[in-house]
Amino acid sequence: MPLREVDKVEVTCLVDNNVDVLLPNTEVAHRPFLAKNWYERPLIAEHGFSAAVTVELGGRKHRVLLDSGLDPLAAAHNADVLDFDLSNCELVISSHGHIDHAGGLLNIRKKMNTRQRIPLVLHEDAFRNRMVKFQDGRTISLPAPSKSFLTKAGYEIIEKHSQSLWIDDGILVTGEIPRTNNFEKGFPNHYSEVEEGQMENDPLIKDDQAVIVNVKDKGLVIITGCGHAGIINTLNHAKELTGEDRIYAVVGGMHLTGGLFEPIITRTVHELERLRPKFVVPCHCSGLKAMSEIARKMPDAFIQNSVGTNYIF
């Protein structure tokens, strides 16, 4: 069954590394309305990502959640500040198992229907403990989400390696993304626990996956968490999976921040230009240098993200 076209999709950013209350609205980016007392309960930015995806299909609206940020409370807090209703959320998708995308899963579940289990779609590798080792000796621990805690919280765990269709075939989750080019080589100093206490180098992060929606008369809207598979690999795979060449919008992390990834920014942006998306919204781990280069080379497509922005495509 192919991916069905939807009439409209909205992507609402609940968690990102940046919040800027002064950004203007654009053709597709609708910034949150600020109440008079906005400073008493401000939107929170952090090193993490979460976005709600709402599609209109067959005269009905359907809402799903991609990722849940780092802090246990941030996504839920921002949803409250935005008065954003998650009680009708039908599905949660985990882009991968890193804590900055899975840290809020337990608390955000309380905002959803508690009378039924909510499917949580993810790759089995998402349950591996991870870490990042820097050349200067520093390490960052990336503890895995707890399958038992998630089940107790009311999720139905659904582990998928390959692509899967959801919401009346209107949302496609990519599953594992093939690495087909010669410059997006993964995360070389990333490690995964293969047995208790035993870490092995894991540059590919195979659990990385993205969400694809095909908007009628426009093309693909592709939402990533971190884009560890490489944003160009991800976009090309989306085209291959759907048979649709038009890319209308790209929203999410591109993992181009830091010294390991900055050398491929120029090549990545060049390839992104060739793919000709109408809108590019780099988030989270994309990094200032990559965002600046996208803005310079693709000024009509680039949109600066901020927590609370609602994109309507």
Q: Model-flagged regions — what are they?
A:
Residues D125-Q209, E273, I303-I312:
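Metallo-beta-lactamase
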Residues L73-V121, T242-A249:
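Active-site metal-binding motif and surrounding structural segment of the metallo-beta-lactamase
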Residues E10-L14, V64-D67, I171-I177, L220-C226:
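Active-site-proximal beta-strand elements of phosphoester/diester hydrolases
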Residues N18-V21, L73, F127-N129, R179-F183, ...:
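Short, acidic Gly/Pro/Ser/Thr-rich loop/turn segments
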Residues N17-D20, N25-L82, L204, D208-T224:
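Conserved beta-strand hairpin/beta-sheet module of binuclear metal-dependent hydrolase folds
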Residues M1-R31, S164-T174:
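N-terminal amphipathic/basic leader segments beginning at the initiator methionine
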Residues H98-A102, P119, M199-V307:
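Cap/insert and terminal regions of metallo-dependent hydrolase folds
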Residues P24-N25, M131-Q135, E262, I294:
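Short acidic, glycine/serine/threonine-rich loops at helix termini
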